[in-house]
């Protein structure tokens, strides 16, 4: 599992860990930076251990992606059974969030306007742009100016097909 990072580069955000610990500890207790760093080191090792076990399970099943079931089985194999219930709960919440997530629609689908109407509007805009361009050419110089032809939407569509 070498993705360009050395093991000593793997870590957790120190400020986030500090805040989590501070929220849990009673107000009269303090948490030193050294203790925080040791906790982070232990957490990273735990994550590495579980993910390595889950990866082995995944490979034995000839799967390419580690799924929640692989993590649950890894927790069982490593005898971290006390984490399984919460892991299942989080996995179920995640699955529900994914189901409820609104699928992003394209601008075309959201517009409520048919393809033909959009093409008509585009043609109209191009026509107006051509008129403005012609008028600018006439107004700015009445001597030798060559207008550049702008293809219509139907001409462009015909060339693409």
Curated annotation (Swiss-Prot):
- Please give the SUPFAM superfamilies that the UniProt record associates with this protein: Histone-fold (SSF47113)
Residue intervals passing through the bilayer = none
GO CC aspect terms: cytosol; negative cofactor 2 complex; nucleus
Question: Which residues are in the Histone-fold domain?
Answer: 11-75
Task: Alphabetically list the UniProt keywords.
Answer: Cytoplasm, Nucleus
Family annotation (Pfam families)? CBFD_NFYB_HMF
Where composition is biased (Polar residues), the residues are 135-147
The places in or outside the cell where this protein is found are: Cytoplasm; Nucleus
Q: Which GO terms describe its biological process?
A: negative regulation of transcription by RNA polymerase II; RNA polymerase II preinitiation complex assembly
This protein's record includes keyword Nucleus: yes
Bias (Basic and acidic residues) occurs at: 93-107
Q: What segment(s) does the record annotate as region Disordered?
A: 93-116, 130-161
- InterPro entries for the chain: CBFA_NFYB_domain (IPR003958), Histone-fold (IPR009072), Ncb2 (IPR042225)
GO MF:
protein heterodimerization activity; RNA polymerase II general transcription initiation factor activity; TBP-class protein binding
PANTHER family on file:
PROTEIN DR1
- Which family is annotated? Belongs to the NC2 beta/DR1 family.
Protein name from the UniProt record: Negative cofactor 2 complex subunit beta
């Amino acid at each position: 599992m070498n993705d360009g990072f050395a093991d000593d580069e793997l870590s957790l955000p120190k400020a986030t860990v500090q805040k989590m610990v501070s929220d849990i500890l009673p107000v009269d207790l303090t948490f030193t930076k050294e203790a925080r760093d040791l906790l982070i080191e232990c957490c990273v090792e735990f994550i590495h251990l579980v993910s390595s076990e889950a990866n082995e399970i995944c490979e034995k099943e000839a799967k390419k992606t580690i799924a929640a079931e692989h993590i649950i089985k890894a927790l069982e194999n490593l005898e971290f059974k006390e984490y399984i219930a919460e892991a299942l709960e989080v996995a179920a919440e995640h699955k529900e969030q994914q189901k409820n997530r609104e699928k992003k629609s394209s601008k075309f689908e959201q517009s409520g306007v048919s393809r033909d109407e959009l093409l008509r509007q585009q043609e109209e805009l191009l026509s107006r742009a051509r008129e403005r361009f012609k008028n600018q050419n006439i107004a700015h110089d009445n001597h030798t100016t060559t207008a550049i032809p702008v293809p219509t939407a139907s001409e462009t569509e015909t060339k693409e097909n």
